[in-house]
Amino acid sequence: SFAKEDVAGLSLDEERERIERTFSGLAELTGTRPEGWFTLPRTGDDYPGGSVSEATGELLLEAGCGYFGNSMADDIPHYWITDYDRRHTLLMLPYYYAMDTQFFMFFPGVGKGSGLVQTRALWENWAAELEGVRAWGRQSTFVIQPYLMQFGAARAVLDRIMRAVTGDPDLWSATSGACAAYWKQAYPADRTLRFEKAAWLDEE
């Protein structure tokens, strides 16, 4: 998300502007408009799931977003019903912070109990996750923060995971966009979802 700010404190128009500024800025830099959206947590947050507001899902759809990249609800993609009455959905891809490099490099921040660099723990998590993915055929997202993975032990761990993933014929190494495209074709929302009011919601 733009500047990793907490969007829960923004107005609807402010959040809409931030989303468009992010998509447009990345399109200008790369020549391609992003297909999806990640609201990754900040290392100083008390919560690990990033920041969304009640309007985020609908605003992302309005901006042409094809998927939301960091949902911790499952280890397979699933659909977020952003507007029940209008049957609006946004595809959610798996994310878990134990697979995110930022929580193993100078986290918490220096002066806040930092564990400094925990590359061995990061590799143990990644290696165990690969075993689980092979065994059960699920999806896992490895989040690599390039600025944290440039040198020494961190670079060695990055090289190791890249070799492990790309060298295994039983694993499909794909971008989030490719994963989203596959899931939407194999399990389209209009054929796989059964819209029902949640039992715990009060009926008007």
Question: Positions of the model-derived regions?
Answer:
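Short, flexible loop/turn elements at secondary-structure junctions
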Residues: 1, 41, 97, 146-148, ...
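Glycine-rich, often proline-containing surface loops adjacent to acidic residues and nearby aromatics
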Residues: 1-3, 36, 137-143
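Surface-exposed, active-site-proximal loop segments in enzymatic domains
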Residues: 2-14, 106-111
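Active-site beta->alpha N-cap acidic-glycine motif
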Residues: 2-5, 38-41, 56, 124, ...
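Catalytic domains of cell-wall/extracellular-matrix polysaccharide-remodeling enzymes
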Residues: 6-95, 101, 149, 153-157
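Pocket-edge positions in alpha/beta enzyme catalytic cores
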Residues: 7-11, 114, 118, 171
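C-terminal domain-boundary segment and adjacent tail
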Residues: 67, 73, 79, 120-204
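A conserved mid-domain beta-alpha-beta active-site/ligand-binding segment of alpha/beta enzyme cores
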Residues: 89-128, 134
